[in-house]
Amino acid sequence: MTLTSFHPGQVWNDTNGNRIQAHGGSIITVDGVYYWYGENKEFTVPGSTIWHWGVRCYSSTDLYNWEDRGLIVPPVEDDPEHPLHPGQAVDRPHIIFNEQTGKFVCWIKVMSKGSLQRSTVLVADDILGPYEIVQTWLRPLSMSAGDFDLVVDPHDGKGYYVFERVHSELIVADLTDDYTNVTGYYSTHFPQPQPPFVREAPAHFYRDRKHYLLTSGTTGYYPNPSESAVSPTIHGPYTVLGDLHPTDASRTSFHTQISSVFEHPLKKDLYIALGDRWLPTYLDDGDRAHRAFEEHFAPGRDGDVRMEEFAEVNTSRADYVWLPLRFEGDRPVIDWHDEWSLDDFEDR
């Protein structure tokens, strides 16, 4: 069935009729074709030791109908210590194109047992690969680096790595000219004492000469209120603008965590928030999970708070919620739509 509109939160199949597996995903445009890539979670079910099955990519010319282009970063099955082994917690791949080197550069977060999180960096001549690993177990700035976004300045091509310093604050770091490492220069933002208050899952976009960051709180796969902030420069200072979903009474960002923001190249002022509904059957409000995580990470606690309810999830069945941003002055806002279309927006 050919789609002609978006249906947020509904099961989204590819052109072969299979459930799309591109979680924690982003879109990159290459030669007029859209490529949506993300974590392949098809085998990540409760009781499984499989966290991921590589990075899968899809292509489209209309953003509605997606052709499966396969695994652009396959799992490494025969080495449990390899960062791409299916048992490693591979999350949130991001790919940017380097005009100077002609390479596509992919960063992937890998979370080890405990709280240490590091990065693997790969490069390719084509968006579909093959990708060659150039960095493994990288600790940018000697920090434990969690959820992140990669940013290319639209004016000078300079690259930035925006990441959560785990359970602490948000970092904006300059990338090297080839985008495969950090230079050492960075700025810090939104310091918080502990989850669930720490901001994670940063999604950057640029509009009207301003830099925006959308972030979530830290409650695992359980959704919580998203927050927006704006700055005249990528290194800040950022002004917090408040809840991104002010009409959502559940305080769960419409049961979604945003992974990236896509600026449509052919539509005027259309920015699409790409989100994962990690837990389609979890319809509770966000306060219960928020309280559980706050207590679990409280100073002096040693992890003895019961968290089983918030640990056993089936991300193989996660859905997607794509919604357009609208702006009240400088403030981005997301409203719920059961269905929406690109035809609702003016052409450039």
Model-derived regions, located:
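Carbohydrate-active catalytic/glycan-binding domains of CAZyme proteins
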Residues: 1-348
